[in-house]
Each structure stands twice: as C-alpha cells, then as structure tokens.
C-alpha cells in the first residue's frame, strides 16, 4: 500500500485527490489542479523500463531509484501486508488487521501498475454506507457501531490483474424431450434422445482478479463489478491521501482462477444455446484459452476491519460504485438478555392477566 504526499504550490499544504471533483485539491487554500499537470513528473519517473514477467502481461514498467526517493516499504508481521509510505512516517497501522507495521525495504524492481480507477466516492460516503449496513442489526456488538471506530475506515487501492482472453470451445450434449399422452386406457410417456453439438469462440475482456493475499477472494469478487471503461493510465498523484496495497500474487498465480471463470462462463453461454429440450447434459467439453494477457491495475476500495472475540471482520465498499459487503456477527450475550427480557415480560403479563381474572371472579 502506498501513501504519497504532494505539496500545494500555492500554500505548501498537503494535496489530496478529490473523488467528487476528479482533481487534486488543497484542503487548506482550496486550490485545484488537473491531473494533466502531473503527467510530466510521472513521465520522468517512468524513464527506466524493464521486462519483469515471463507470462504474457501488458505490464512492463517497474519502480526505479527515482520512484523510490523519499519512500519506504513497511511490512505487517501479523497478516503479511506490505505498504509504502513516505519516509517521514514513523509508524502506521495495517488497514487489514490494525496491527503495527515495521520498515523492511523499497519498491525497486517491483512491477508498476498500468491502470488505476480513481476513487469516485469519498470517506463521508463510505461511512454513510457502513452505517446503513448496520441499520436494524439489534444484536450487533457495540464495537461495530462506535463512531470513533467508524472514523477509522481507510481508502485503499487494491491490486488486481485485469485479464483478456479468447476461448475456443466445442461441446457435446445428450438431450431429451419428454411427452405424455393417452392411448385408450393407457397413459404413455415418450422420451426421445438427441445429440447436440456446439462449437465457436468467445472473447473476454477486463476480467478482474485481485492480486492480494490479505483480502479474501470471495470478498473482492462480491465487490464487482468495476466499470473498467473508467480506468486511466496510472499516475501516483491519484494515490495522494490514499493507500495502495503492494501486490503479492503474480499474474501466473492468478491464471488458474481466471481460467476457471472463463471456462465457467463459456460453458454457461454454450449451454444457453441448447434450448427446447426437457433435459440437457454435457458429455464432452473441449475448451482452449488463447491469447491471454494481463494488465496490472489498482482499484478503489474502502476498507474497515474490526476484531471481536478473537475474530477479524473485514468490511469493504467499492470506491467507484458504492457496493458494500461484509458479514456481521451476533452478540450471543445480548441475544440471551433480550430473550430473557422478553420471557420476563411475557411472564409478568400472564401473571397480571391471571390476577385480574381471579380478582373479578
């Protein structure tokens, strides 16, 4: 994860990327700057290019000595997360598990992102959506709704591999049609069997697969979809005021996951074309994936973690669309209190009714 500082040329204040305006803004003097002014700086930092992956990827740029100037890499000894901050930051906490982090090295040689989707929703929107997520949860432990805790929600650019692939497939199916009719006194069921064949190709573009071991795959998949048409070429200025997770899953490691998603989608698409039968069963499947390429991208996610009774609960919101995900626990002790309280009220009501009946009879 990276937390970078840019100084305002007007007042020397710390600049931040404003999600609503889509510009870099100074919160002290309200000066606004278009992203174009940072292009020349990034072009100079990107002057050294190096091939880094043997697998077919669109990503070739790496962090260089000039990129690393004034930056340090920290590691979380608890969950293994690696983050990048400016060297003036003496200490920080992990956004995934809230544990302390320690200095470990720099980014030189690491692959640099190709694309980034800037945050569209700010911290205020994330807090509002989290509060809405808690609404009506009467058995929720109080730590989850503590206002000071809600203020700890963090904007994190999560690393993703964006895959493009072509699937060439041929499928064979056993199909049946079933008809019932009456002949005299007999009810006849006629089942006819058919063979169906399908072949063709499908193009897949912009399949996102997260490149971080610290966040659960099911959580990141639940945050989808991201509108990748809004992705722009990576510039470090977009990270001002936010963090960016350092990827620890390579494109090769993620290939198995994306291949499974492509194959599942291909099988479903082909099966949808076999219509008009009572039953359809696949008997042979041959799917070949070709021309697979991957781009390295950073996608915006608001993250908050809460530890309760030894378990870590992570809540996340898509920083582009506002989609919110995360499981909430039930406070069993509070549940028992409510149950006993309800039972006590019922007992008192029953006693009162009985007493009144006895009194007036």
Language model: regions and residue ranges:
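Residues immediately within or flanking Cys/His clusters that coordinate Zn2+
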Residues: 3-5, 21-23, 69-73, 91
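Short Cys/His-rich micro-motifs in 6-15 aa windows
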Residues: 30-37, 98-105
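Short cysteine-rich clusters marking metal-coordination/redox-active sites
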Residues: 8-11, 26-29, 76-79, 94-97
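Short functional micro-motifs and their immediate structural scaffolds
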Residues: 13-16, 34, 84, 102
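Juxtamembrane boundary at the C-terminal end of a transmembrane helix
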Residues: 351-361
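Charged, low-complexity helical/coil segments in non-catalytic cytosolic or luminal regions
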Residues: 109-307, 311, 359-360
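Short cysteine/histidine-rich zinc-coordinating motifs and their immediately flanking basic loops
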Residues: 21-25, 38-44, 88-93, 106-112
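Extended hydrophobic
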Residues: 163, 295-345
């Amino acid at each position: 994860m990276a937390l970078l500082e840019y100084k305002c040329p007007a007042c020397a204040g710390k600049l931040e990327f404003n999600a609503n305006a889509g510009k870099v803004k100074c919160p002290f003097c309200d000066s606004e700057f278009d992203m174009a002014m940072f292009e020349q700086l990034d072009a100079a930092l990107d002057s050294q290019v190096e091939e880094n992956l043997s697998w077919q990827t669109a990503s070739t740029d790496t962090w260089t000595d000039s990129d690393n100037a004034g930056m340090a890499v920290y590691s979380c000894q608890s969950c293994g997360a690696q983050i990048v901050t400016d060297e003036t930051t003496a200490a920080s906490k992990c956004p995934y598990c809230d544990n302390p982090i320690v200095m470990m090295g720099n980014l030189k040689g690491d692959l640099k992102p190709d694309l980034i989707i800037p945050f569209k929703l700010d911290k205020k929107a994330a807090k509002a959506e989290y509060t809405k997520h808690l609404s009506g949860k009467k058995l929720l432990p109080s730590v989850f709704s503590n206002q000071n805790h809600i203020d700890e929600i963090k904007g994190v650019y999560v690393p993703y591999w964006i895959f493009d692939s072509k699937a060439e497939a041929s499928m064979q199916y056993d199909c049946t049609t079933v008809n019932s009719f009456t002949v005299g006194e007999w009810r006849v069921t006629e089942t006819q069997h058919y063979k169906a064949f399908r072949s063709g190709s499908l193009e897949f573009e912009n399949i996102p697969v997260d490149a971080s071991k610290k966040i659960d795959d099911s959580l990141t998949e639940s945050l989808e979809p991201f509108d990748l048409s809004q992705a722009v070429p990576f510039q470090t200025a977009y990270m001002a005021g936010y963090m960016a997770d350092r990827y620890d899953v390579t494109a090769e490691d993620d290939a198995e996951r994306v291949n499974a998603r492509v194959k599942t989608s291909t099988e479903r698409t082909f099966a949808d074309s076999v219509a008009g039968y009572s039953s359809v069963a696949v008997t042979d499947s041959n799917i070949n994936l070709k021309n697979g390429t991957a781009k390295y991208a950073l996608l915006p996610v608001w993250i908050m973690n809460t530890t309760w009774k030894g378990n870590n609960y992570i809540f996340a919101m898509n920083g582009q669309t506002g989609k919110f995900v995360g499981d909430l626990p039930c406070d069993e002790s509070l549940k028992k209190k409510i149950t006993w309280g309800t039972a006590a009220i019922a007992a008192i009501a029953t006693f009162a009714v009985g007493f009144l009946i006895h009194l007036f009879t």
